[in-house]
């Protein structure tokens, strides 16, 4: 890479996406950064996962400054991986942009063609039909196998339940059925061996995910919010006691203190 280009980049007041690609080319090129040059898709795989979660956290905390920063980190990962592929001649970042542009145009025929879609449900139905046609997935099994196994378990369960129909119980209309199912599984777990207990616990979690989906709730979002509330509760108890609640209280006192705190919140 021309040293003059590197010098000019340092003097810019505002950078563009093209500049990001150029910087990555410099870092990966001859005489570039030793660390960047050594990386492979596999070696920075976890970085991509971590950066993605940090974007989600920025969204959840409604912090636009942090969101801007974290989106940049994710964009860096995209450019990094695309640059590796360009170096071996398989594709480059323009190919990536081309493919997603073509996909968006093809999957929005109600915008770029004459297909009618008067509401969100019709748009989503068209999207899934076009997606299935593109991927040549003609069976439900194909669609289920196409759901990435690396997804968070609760999110994956939602997708499998929605596509398979194996969670057809209408817990939203009959919440007592959900309660009965969970109680039955709890009873069976108490009597089962370790191997069976794990299976029953999985069924219980899937039933809980189904209940949420039927009510229009996302399991990941709901569990994250509840976990955050419990952290906040513990911090408040620690502040009120001036000590670690687990050391200052017996398990029974800790449970009672937490219940009192929840009741004060109207929970």
Roles of regions detected by a PLM:
Residues 1-70, 76-267:
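Flexible "arm" and connector segments at domain edges
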């Amino acid at each position: 890479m021309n040293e003059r280009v590197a010098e000019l980049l340092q003097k810019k007041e505002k950078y563009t996406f093209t500049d990001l690609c150029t910087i990555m080319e410099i870092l990966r090129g001859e005489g570039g950064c030793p660390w960047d040059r050594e990386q492979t898709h596999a070696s920075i795989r976890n970085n991509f996962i971590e950066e993605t979660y940090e974007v989600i956290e920025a969204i959840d905390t409604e912090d636009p400054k942090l969101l801007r920063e974290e989106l940049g980190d994710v964009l860096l990962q995209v450019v990094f991986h695309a640059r590796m592929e360009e170096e071996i001649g398989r594709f480059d970042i323009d190919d990536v942009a081309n493919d997603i542009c073509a996909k968006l145009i093809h999957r929005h025929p109600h915008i770029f063609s004459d297909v009618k879609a008067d509401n969100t449900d019709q748009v989503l139905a068209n999207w899934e039909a076009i997606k299935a046609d593109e991927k040549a997935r003609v069976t439900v099994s194909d669609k289920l196998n196409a759901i990435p196994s690396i997804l968070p378990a609760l999110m994956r369960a939602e997708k499998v339940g929605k596509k398979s129909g194996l969670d057809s119980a209408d817990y939203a209309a009959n919440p007592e059925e959900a309660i009965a199912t969970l109680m039955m599984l709890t009873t069976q777990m108490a009597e089962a061996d370790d191997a069976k207990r794990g299976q029953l616990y999985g069924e219980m979690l899937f039933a809980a995910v189904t209940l949420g989906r039927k009510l229009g709730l996302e399991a990941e979002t709901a569990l994250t919010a509840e976990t955050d509330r419990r952290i906040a509760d513990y911090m408040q108890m620690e502040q009120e006691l001036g000590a670690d609640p687990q050391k200052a209280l017996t398990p029974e006192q800790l449970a009672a203190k937490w219940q009192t705190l929840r009741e004060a919140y109207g929970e």
